[in-house]
Amino acid sequence: DLNKIMMMVVAAMMVTVNANAQVEDLRHEIGVTYGTGLSVVGDGIGEGLGLAIANGMFGGGKFGTETYDEKDFGTLSLEYFYHLNNPRVAIGGILGYATTSQKYRDQNSKVYEGDRTRSYYTVMPSFKYYWVNKEYFGLYSKAAIGATFVHAKANSEKDGKNESATENKTYFAFQASFIGVEGGIKNLRAFVEGGFGEQGIVALGGLRVKF
């Protein structure tokens, strides 16, 4: 009858409100992410900066020197977000770190002559919008802009001489994660994002805690 229908509707509304309240109560969020690659801007500036000081020592390959053992650590980030009264909106910040390295050797003898490293430190205020925000599942987009500080260092052990040089540069940084998917229990979720920027290219993943 009508009374039963009304009671069912009210009960369903109460369950929905309660579920939303549970999500809204979790205002704070801390996450750790890992991504591979840097933006074209960041990689280009870092590469140019590293080459500028390395070429002065090794001749940029002009004098029988070649590079080898190139390593790319990827980008490790720490995120914090605060969820506003609107459960779909969160604001916060991102700290990121990435590093790359390579060694130099004589092209003929293959004798080690030195190395160079580039370290990237990123700080970005960020914004996240949830298209879906359920207790155990979320679908969102994320954007961030800020600055990346690059520290480049080259060491030379060529011809029995030990030399080193460093240089620093700052450039505009950003992250655009077009789509992110998270899932897990109420307070702990794993996630994966597809995007582009200082946190990684194409995809990055991690773990976040909400409280």
Regions found by a protein language model. Give the residues of each.
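Cleavable N-terminal export/targeting peptides
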Residues: D1-R27
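Short glycine/proline- and aromatic-enriched beta-strand/turn motifs that initiate or cap beta-hairpins
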Residues: A21-L84
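Predominantly the C-terminal beta-signal and adjacent terminal strand-loop region
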Residues: V23-D25, S39, D43-I45, A165-F211
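Outer-envelope beta-barrel architecture signal
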Residues: E24-I30, P87-I91, E135-S141, K186-L188, ...
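Residues that define the transmembrane beta-barrel architecture of outer-membrane proteins
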Residues: L26-H28, E70-L76, T117-V123, F137, ...
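Transmembrane beta-strands of outer-membrane beta-barrel pores
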Residues: Y34-V40, L95-S101, S119, I145-K153, ...
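Flexible, solvent-exposed loop segments that connect beta-strands
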Residues: G42-D69, Y97-Y121, F149-F172
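Gram-negative (and chloroplast) outer-membrane scaffold detector with strong preference
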Residues: K71-A154
